[in-house]
């Protein structure tokens, strides 16, 4: 009986050790310690949302990311302690800012709830079908460019390219668009007439080019561009799941626009400013 008790005690102790190891202390600081569970509770929801992947354990993060998360968590704790020691929250200015922040948060919550309750499955399906219909038969192109300040610089680059110069190397060395220059001038795939994508002058010239053709210099508000088309292919038709974020954003914008217009109408809003024409003529 005594032997069985010893065995049972040993198993219990081992189980306790194993359980304790599941929530390891990953950092200590003056006044406390940080466990894996605290980090996961603090960051897991937003990290899953940002990455689109399910993060289950602290060990799923690379070591460098683990250290960053620990530092962010501890820094927040330390700043919270500093706030508690100060009188900053009792000032009139802070209270006004706090009230403004609460109002903004309440408005965001109101609008989010309104959107959620006013977008139906039928609205989503109709908008998706419209969205897909606009994509059918369309072409997308993969473009690269070299951006410079003057027409002379652009002409010089065009001359170098016509003599066998390497577009990728010239983009890396000379382009003012550093984001694409680091990738040999490659911007990526674009569609024609997509709002907020690229300026019209650039698009018009790019879509007139053949694959591997290089444009003459093109002027935009950004400077002078030499454009090259790397690839052309049909626009892929996204599934409902793939298009969900885009469709949700389109519908949300439409619903909110109508909601705000209705509020203004109910409030009988009248703008009392003078008309633009009368101001210009005075």
From Swiss-Prot:
It catalyses: [protein]-peptidylproline (omega=180) = [protein]-peptidylproline (omega=0). InterPro entries: PPIase_dom_sf, PPIase_PpiC, PrsA_foldase. GO terms for cellular component: cell outer membrane. Its EC number is 5.2.1.8. It is found in: Cell outer membrane. Transmembrane segments: none annotated. It holds the Pfam family Rotamase_3. Gene3D superfamilies: 3.10.50.40. Residues 138-231 form the PpiC domain. Keywords: Cell outer membrane, Isomerase, Membrane, Rotamase, Signal. It comes from the Bacteria. One of its GO terms (molecular function) is peptidyl-prolyl cis-trans isomerase activity. This is Parvulin-like PPIase. It comes from Rickettsia conorii (strain ATCC VR-613 / Malish 7).
């Amino acid at each position: 009986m005594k032997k069985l008790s010893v065995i049972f005690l040993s198993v219990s102790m081992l189980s306790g050790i194993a359980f304790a190891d599941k929530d390891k202390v990953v950092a200590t600081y003056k006044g406390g310690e940080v466990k894996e569970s605290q980090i996961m509770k603090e960051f897991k929801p937003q990290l899953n949302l940002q990455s689109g992947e399910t993060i289950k354990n602290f060990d799923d993060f690379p070591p460098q990311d683990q250290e960053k998360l620990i530092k962010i968590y501890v820094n927040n704790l330390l700043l919270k302690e500093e706030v508690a020691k100060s009188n900053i929250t009792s000032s009139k200015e802070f209270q006004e800012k706090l009230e403004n922040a609460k109002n903004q948060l309440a408005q965001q919550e109101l609008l989010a709830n309104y959107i959620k309750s006013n977008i139906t499955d039928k609205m989503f399906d109709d908008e998706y079908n419209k969205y897909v219909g606009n994509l059918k038969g369309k072409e997308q192109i993969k473009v690269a460019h070299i951006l410079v300040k003057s027409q002379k610089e652009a002409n010089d680059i065009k001359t170098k390219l016509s003599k066998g110069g390497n577009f990728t190397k010239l983009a890396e060395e000379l382009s003012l668009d550093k984001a694409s220059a680091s990738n040999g001038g490659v911007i990526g795939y674009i569609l024609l007439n997509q709002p907020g994508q690229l300026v019209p002058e650039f698009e018009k010239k790019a879509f007139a080019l053949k694959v591997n053709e290089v444009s003459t210099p093109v002027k935009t508000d950004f400077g002078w561009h030499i454009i090259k088309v790397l690839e052309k292919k049909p626009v892929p038709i996204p599934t409902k799941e793939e298009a969900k974020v885009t469709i949700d954003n389109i519908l949300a914008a439409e619903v909110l626009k109508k909601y705000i217009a209705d509020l203004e109408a109910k409030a009988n809003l009248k703008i009392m400013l003078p008309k633009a024409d009368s101001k210009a003529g005075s």
